[in-house]
């Protein structure tokens, strides 16, 4: 069973809890709903299947606009920088991405993300969450926003992020191209 760390899982739970007007049982399994009543532990592991279903529920009930999903990914950085104080190397985007490489296994217990290419001013990120196409698309947009903001917090300027390939449209893998100036 693939799992996600509580530091990421908590964002989905918070979003669902914030909408008391929605009947989440229409989208989630009984075992998923139990997490809405529990305290999410930052360092605990949670089922990726539940994470995927929660993400799809958010898309269905809150927003299916990928620009909103991208903005949510950007917003995650501020919280993760509090939890992982050494994630950002101020003034050094490359070192920050190197630190992410080290930390990435602490977010998922499988190879969801890879940074195979990293040079000054450019990098590529491979995304493979192994979810259904709609969930994979949303998670990839969230990831794109995450890396945009991570680079900005590290001091990068003129950050550009774009998809080179997308698994949800039939490509073998999703690849994000990152470019920036320092």
Language model segments and positions:
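Short alpha-helical "patches" and their helix-cap loops
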Residues: 22-34, 98-102, 158-167
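N-terminal leader/assembly segments
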Residues: 1-63
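Short, mixed-charge aromatic SLiMs
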Residues: 31-39, 79-80, 166-176
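Amphipathic interaction/junction segments at domain boundaries or subunit interfaces
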Residues: 39-142, 165
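Short terminal or interdomain "cap/linker" segment that borders an active site or interface and mediates
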Residues: 1-13, 17, 105-144, 152-182
